[in-house]
């Protein structure tokens, strides 16, 4: 059978392994499996959100409000925007897909960091775009500028903070870079982990309204999957000027967000105390990781997210380490597919992190 020729160069995205898979493949009881692979919030979902979902469960026979009025209104009030500046997606990665289909076609150019969220490249290849990457692993804006001057770009992706490495650009450096970009180039600022970065360092905070007012060719993406603990509900959002939003809506299918997902997101926005408490605990536990990794003589990338990237250098092979941990019921993310001899570990609860340290010690002693 013939398929679109551009798919020959497309790799499928490798998601973090689910707990159910480990139970099936290794015969480990589900209560003994710890998942620290997908940057989910280990503290669960706000009790207020759970109560709202239970209340609305009886309405699942009805289609959702396709205008998404209440969620847009809540986001508009929180970020001082108009509802017309907002688009809602099934996760922020759906809005990434909208952006590429709205701006790119075969041989369009997309500029991104060498090591960043894999879906930028995958979605770009779906339309046959040319992918231009920096040579430096982390976001080097000087190199971005050089490549932009040389090749141009229809879209530039900036992941702030960056997944899967965890580093984060300063807001002022981002703004200086954006001043040099042509107004016909769409700049996607992926802020999936911005809540964490802004909590840790005010210099990393990007205000969505200021961003899109200052740079009308920019779109800011956020998600409810990380700090707001709604990974299973799949809700993301994009903020941009009306012209961008209107064109993205031409690609969106109706009813792309479920009734329960909309309600959960609205309720999650109300419980900032829960969110801030989770983020505070995250960075307290991250200190333990930094101390552990330093003591073991490994390298880590200072992280502004809810995960940490641990590099093994030439001492161990990350794929082997991740596999041995998996066999013991500990799921982490091997970064071999990103050409990194490293693992990415979600910062868990204290007891989960203690278990990770114990199992990692055991694995390393036997490799």
Swiss-Prot record:
Co-factor requirement: pyridoxal 5'-phosphate
Signal listed as a keyword: no
Single biological process term from Gene Ontology: L-histidine biosynthetic process
This enzyme's EC code(s): 2.6.1.9
Listed name of the protein: Histidinol-phosphate aminotransferase
Keyword Transferase in record: yes
Substrates-to-products reaction catalysed: L-histidinol phosphate + 2-oxoglutarate = 3-(imidazol-4-yl)-2-oxopropyl phosphate + L-glutamate
Pathway annotation: Amino-acid biosynthesis; L-histidine biosynthesis; L-histidine from 5-phospho-alpha-D-ribose 1-diphosphate: step 7/9
NCBIfam families in UniProt: hisC
InterPro entries: Aminotrans_II_pyridoxalP_BS, Aminotransferase_I/II_large, HisP_aminotrans, HistidinolP_aminotransfase, PyrdxlP-dep_Trfase, PyrdxlP-dep_Trfase_major, PyrdxlP-dep_Trfase_small
UniProt-recorded Gene Ontology molecular function terms: histidinol-phosphate transaminase activity; pyridoxal phosphate binding
Signal peptide: none
Recorded family membership: Belongs to the class-II pyridoxal-phosphate-dependent aminotransferase family. Histidinol-phosphate aminotransferase subfamily.
Classification via HAMAP family: HisC_aminotrans_2 (MF_01023)
N6-(pyridoxal phosphate)lysine: residues carrying this PTM: 226
């Amino acid at each position: 059978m013939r398929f679109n020729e551009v798919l020959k160069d497309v790799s499928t995205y490798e998601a973090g392994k689910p707990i159910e898979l480990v139970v099936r493949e290794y015969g480990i009881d589900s209560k003994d499996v710890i998942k620290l692979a997908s940057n989910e919030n280990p503290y669960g979902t706000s009790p207020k959100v759970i109560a709202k979902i239970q209340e609305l469960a009886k309405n699942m026979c009805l289609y959702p409000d396709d205008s998404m009025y209440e969620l847009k209104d809540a986001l508009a009030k929180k970020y001082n925007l108009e509802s017309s500046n907002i688009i809602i997606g099934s996760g922020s990665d759906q809005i990434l897909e909208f952006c590429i289909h709205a701006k790119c076609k075969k041989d369009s150019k997309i500029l991104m960091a060498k090591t960043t969220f894999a879906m930028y490249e995958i979605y770009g290849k779906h339309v046959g775009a040319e992918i231009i990457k920096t040579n430096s692993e982390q976001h080097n804006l000087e190199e971005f500028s050089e490549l932009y001057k040389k090749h141009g770009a229809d879209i530039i992706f900036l992941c702030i903070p960056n997944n899967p490495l965890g580093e984060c650009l300063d807001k002022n450096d981002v703004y200086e870079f954006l001043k040099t970009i042509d107004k016909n180039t769409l700049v996607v600022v992926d802020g999936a982990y911005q809540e964490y970065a802004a909590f840790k360092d005010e210099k990393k905070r990007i205000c969505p309204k200021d961003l899109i007012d200052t740079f009308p060719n920019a779109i800011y993406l956020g998600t409810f999957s990380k700090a707001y603990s709604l990974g299973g509900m799949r809700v993301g959002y994009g903020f941009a000027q009306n012209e961008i939003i209107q064109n993205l809506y031409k690609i969106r299918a109706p009813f792309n967000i479920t009734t329960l997902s909309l309600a959960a997101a609205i309720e999650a926005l109300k419980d900032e105390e829960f969110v801030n408490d989770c983020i505070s605990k995250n960075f307290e536990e991250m200190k333990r990781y930094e101390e552990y990794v330093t003591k073991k003589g490994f390298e880590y990338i200072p992280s502004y997210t809810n995960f940490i990237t641990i590099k093994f250098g030439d001492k161990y092979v990350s794929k082997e380490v991740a596999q041995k941990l998996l066999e013991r019921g500990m799921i982490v993310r091997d970064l071999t597919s990103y050409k990194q001899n490293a693992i990415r570990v979600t910062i868990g609860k204290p007891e989960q992190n203690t278990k990770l340290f114990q199992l990692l010690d055991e694995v390393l002693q036997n490799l």
